[in-house]
């Protein structure tokens, strides 16, 4: 398990340790084309008919309930669906004239399903809130049908509201078990909304190669919730986020990666805006994989979130910025067994579980319990063809209809599971797993750019063989946790953790050991120092330990990683800022794709809280006012990004060569010891060596700089570096030095204003724990 894997603690759920023998699982049948079953509620082209289609192989009866209003009123129609035994799809088509004239629905059509099955057979005498027909909460086949629970359509394009809101605060109505199974959830349950086709433009998608991206990870609500430049009513919304496209483009960001925006349980955050009770800010508990989260919309009318999302995407596209979204297909918002129960009977039935539990969830070998590699209730059954259909269909919808350019997959190792029930086994060579199906049906963007999706994995989960940094199949980029750890250890744990120069060199050059053995490239390494789950960049260098038990608004937060590889630089604030500059510079000068977290450009702090999943507050909202020091760091970040974008030698399509490939007597990449000699294997492997430099031949990449030189002093004292040959007739010029004496608005020199340092054999003295960047000209 990755020592920095997300620690997500949720009330009402628990991690159930299952130690069952591995069970061989049959391969899935051949999968269908994208959206082949046309599931969901869909109007025909003339909007004369509305068809409802839902999958369940185990249900014995399915009914659709139609509503005029999202909550607080009874259904206006209850209609049985018919099953196609060949596809296991239940369907019903209604003329829109009937919906209007017979059922009196003149506005949006809200709907939900109720399902019966072997553990609760249909009985015509059943009424809402009754036990008529009940046999058991779960049977030996894993069925958990309960007609008292109105179920959200897994393919709904929008949903009415979350299950729990200010007016529907009783979460027990969704539960099974003796105390709750007869409670009817219809008045409060989330309902699907039938939407007609929408023509809102998403603009022209950028087609840049992944290697050229600079990724900015941010929460769509947190981006503007605290921004006075955005109209008050638009703060924290898609519409508000659209207003920041120009600012992010000016920073140099090329791709914005939003934390989950698929509908999640977060309406409860508004019940008590100054409390963490029941709050879910990050959004990693997905209720529906097609619907943009309604809470983030300024326009909350039916269809409003979809239109507003698309308009926001267009704003980013118009600014040349790709839009990525963080997706959570390893588990769902239904969670697992209720805390404090026997783990068998009491579960939430919101959608998937009540329609076809064994199809949508990986279960224990006796089908009674969830199999959990996620820590939040149980694995989504990513090896089942129907569950895979939903993954691929929803991804295609976000890509094609909603304009998304790429996806970051949370705990993506679960999508490499090669079995369904009673076991977990990551197998990248299993052609039928979800990872390989996604690549086959949603082709990744070509290496040189063009049409396609950028696919990024968080390559770990919990337990088993789920830690897979470097282990994903072709087509997948990965969050490189080993890059993060190497930098943190070297910067913050000198004398405690061993990181050799060879390890650093491998990470700085694109991690050939991880991605070069299977045909992948340096740009399949998504490099990062911090992410949303953990310390901010500022806090990584300002705190020795997490500070999660703070009063509102910066806490309290449970969980959180204890092994952070952080250090407060001896409490010296100037050294903390220097460390942040150095870490950011190493990130921007490494081969691979850099990712920063929203606010790190201005030294945003969470005051040491490293698990702010439950804080819908100023702890997570970006602040846009700047002190002089914050403004300096933002300028520093902006200029570093600009330098990276201006120099293709830093963004190689292939791993660097140690040879001279263009005949100018300079190797494409050469590593140096501080004394100017070439670093050899003995130096690379020396645990007591803490300084390293490298030179890239820019001419081999068509770079405007004939050579680029980077020196990193990871030692606790000053070190002199002897500069190498800059090329015939060239001298070295300083772009930046992260030393404390160079802090300020011009810490990174603008093109043409670099400082002359000298030629070959010039000696340059470097402060402890600092970085030097030179170009030859």
Swiss-Prot record:
Binds 1 Ca(2+) ion per subunit. Its cofactor is Ca(2+). Optimum pH is 6-7. Residues 1-32 form the signal peptide. GO terms for biological process: carbohydrate metabolic process. The record marks 533 as: Transition state stabilizer. InterPro entries: GlgX_Isoamylase_N_E_set, Glyco_hydro_13_cat_dom, Glyco_hydro_13_N, Glyco_hydro_b, Glycoside_hydrolase_SF, Ig-like_fold, Ig_E-set, Isoamylase_C. It is an enzyme of class 3 (hydrolase). Keywords: Calcium, Disulfide bond, Glycosidase, Hydrolase, Metal-binding, Signal. Ca(2+) binds at residues 162, 263-264, 266, 293. The active site is at 410 (nucleophile), 458 (proton donor). Monomer. This is Isoamylase. The lineage of its organism: Bacteria, Pseudomonadati, Bacteroidota, Flavobacteriia, Flavobacteriales.
